[in-house]
A protein has these predicted regions:
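Accessory nucleic-acid engagement/destabilization modules that flank
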Residues: 3-11, 15-217
């Protein structure tokens, strides 16, 4: 475990070690597939951001069985951070993938319904500003490109931005290529997330099996 990082993702693991491990496994798995190298950055940002919301004292206390309020939930704020970090072409898919990485991806427009998502991030924003912003800036420094976590929190605290995102999801149309990309990166994130905790490495077969194996099976 990296001694300079105090925030944890799991009781015995630092947040930094976990998300960088997930990133490395997902990218290694993707490289093995030898498809779409142009989405490397998309995969990397999704993996690095997927547990951002664990960087609150609410979640840290939850790991110690000392807190169980809604503020411990890391999915929604992590999804918003992913949206903020990604370029426009990947914002919506990244949001969906991260928001549902502990569940199932539903209809995109349903993911932003007011009655299904807690959009009140004020307590989490204040908590990060007061307690963990320095470490989060350190963790994400490579990816912020001159920005900082405070800029994200200020953006998140602006209600007009949240309304705009909801409107975008209601209007956006998706095609089959979007669906396949979403499912593919979602599967890489889940693979990386589980493999990092179990074996801390990607599972890469010793050899590639010929296509005839699949055709004969079918």
């Amino acid at each position: 475990m990296s001694s300079s990082y105090k925030l944890k993702s799991h009781p015995t693991q630092s947040l930094y070690d976990h998300i960088t491990g997930v990133r490395d496994i997902a990218l290694k798995t993707h490289k093995y597939h030898t498809i779409k190298p142009e989405i490397d950055d998309f995969i990397e940002i999704v993996c690095m951001c997927h547990d951002f919301g664990k960087g609150t004292t609410y979640f840290q206390r939850y790991l110690e069985n000392d807190f169980n309020g809604i503020e411990k939930d890391h999915g929604p704020i992590s999804a918003m951070f992913t949206y903020w970090m990604l370029p426009d072409k990947w914002k919506h898919l990244g949001f969906l993938i991260v928001k549902k990485h502990h569940g199932d991806i539903n209809n995109a427009s349903d993911e932003c319904r007011i009655d299904e998502v807690s959009w009140d991030f004020k307590n989490q924003i204040k908590d990060i500003l007061d307690n963990t912003i320095d470490e989060l800036n350190q963790i994400y420094d490579k990816y912020l490109e001159g920005k900082n976590i405070e800029a994200f929190l200020n953006w998140l605290d602006d209600e007009s931005n949240l309304k705009s995102i909801k409107k975008e999801f209601r209007k956006k149309k998706y095609n089959i290529e979007d669906l396949l990309l979403c499912e593919y990166v979602y599967s890489l994130l889940l693979t990386g997330d589980k493999s990092q905790l179990i074996r801390n490495d990607a599972y890469i077969p010793d050899k590639q099996y010929p296509l005839s194996f699949i055709e004969n099976y079918k």
